[in-house]
Amino acid sequence: MISKLQEKMNSYQRVWAEIDLDAIWENMIHMKENIAPETKILAVIKTDGYGHGGVPIARMLEDVDFMFGYAAATYEEAHVLREAGVKKPILILGYTFPYCYEEMIREEIRPAVYRRDTVEELAEAAAKAGKKAKVHIKVDTGMGRIGITPDDEGLDFVKFVMEHPGLEVEGIFTHFAKSDEADKTSANHQLELFQNFIDRIQSELGLEIPVKHCSNSAAILGMPQANMDMVRAGITTYGLYPSEEVSKDIVPLRAAMSLYSHIIYCKTIHAGQSVSYGGLFTATKDTRVATIPVGYGDGYPRSLSGKGYVLIHGKKAPILGRVCMDQFMVDISGIPGAMEGDKVTLLGADGQERITAEELGELSGRFNYEFVCTLGKRIPRVYRRNGEITEVKDYFENF
C-alpha cells in the first residue's frame, strides 16, 4: 500500500496530507520540559487527532511514561482507539449517551460525569458489565458549557458519585475559557475556584481524588501554576499555537501537517476572460492559469476564493476566482516553469516560502483549529518518521 501511494505521490496523486510524527514527538517533549516533573500529559486526539489521525499518534505515544493517556470527544472516537489496540486510559471529554455505557465500561473508557441520571445509569451498566466504571467529574468554573458548579450543590454531587459502589472516581477537571489570552485574570480566577473546590472536597468530605487536571494547551504554555497531576495537550500536540496572544518562546512547536496536490491542467487566458463560478475574476491581460484538483469537498475552504494562494516551485500562486467543490485555479504567470504534474503545496513549506494553518485560517475567516480539523476523508494521511513513510491512512485505498 505504501509503495503504491508513493508512486501516486510522485506522479498524479490528487491530494494528500503528510503527518510528521517526529514533529509531534518533539512537541510532546518540549511540553513535558515546561511542566512539573510529576505532571503527566493527556494527549487530546478528538476529531481524529485534530484531522491528523488519532490512531497512529496514540500508537506512537503508547509506551511513553509521562503520557497518562488520551482524550476523545465521543464514545465512538474512544472505541476506535481501543479497536486499534490502544491500552492507555481514554477520557471522553463531552457527554456520553446511555446506549454505549456497558461497552464503554468493559473497554475501560472513562466518561466525564456531571449529571445525576448519568451516574445512576452508569452504576446500573457497571453491574451488568461486572466491573467498576472509572469516571472523571467535570466542574464548570466559567466555561458555561457542561459541568457541576463549584459550590455546595457541586459538593453534594461529588458525594453522590462517591457513594455509588459501581463507580470509581479517578479524576476531576475543569476547562479554561480564556487561557489563550495575554491577560490571565479570568483563567487565574477559574483556577482559584477549582482549587478551592478541591480543597473543600478534601476538608469537608475527606476525599482525595487521584487525578486533578485543568490545563489545556494555552495553560501548558503560560500557566505553570495550573499543572496539577495532569495537563491536556490539544492543538499544541500538532505544533499549532492556541492563539496569537500566547508566548511562542517558552515551548517551541513544529507544525506536523503539510498538504499537497499536483497541477492537472495549464492554459493561458486573455484579457476579458473569466475564471470559475460567477466570473468573479476576469483577466485584464494574458494570464497563465493552473488547475488544482482540490476543493471545498475536501475541506479546503471556499472562503479562500480570491484570497488564498498555493506554492509551486517555491513561489506563491494566487487563487483566481471561486474555489469549487473539487477544483480551484491559480495564477502561475510569475512561475514560468510551472507545468502539468508539478507538485503543489497547499499547507507547509516549499523552499523559503511557507503557508501556515494560522494564515489559512485568517484568510478564510476561520482559525487554525478549524482548518486542520475539517480536512476531509478524501485526503489520504501519509505518516513519516525519520523521513520515511511508516503508515498510510487512505479511505479509498482499493482504488
Describe the role of every protein-language-model region.
Residues I2-W25, E76-E77, T96, Y114-E121, ...:
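Active-site anion/phosphate-binding pocket segments in diverse small-molecule metabolic enzymes
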Residues S11, V15-E18, A23-E26, P37-H213:
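Active-site-proximal beta-alpha core segment in soluble small-molecule metabolic enzymes
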Residues N34:
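Conserved PLP-enzyme active-site core in the AAT-like
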Residues M31:
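Class I S-adenosylmethionine-dependent transferase superfamily signal
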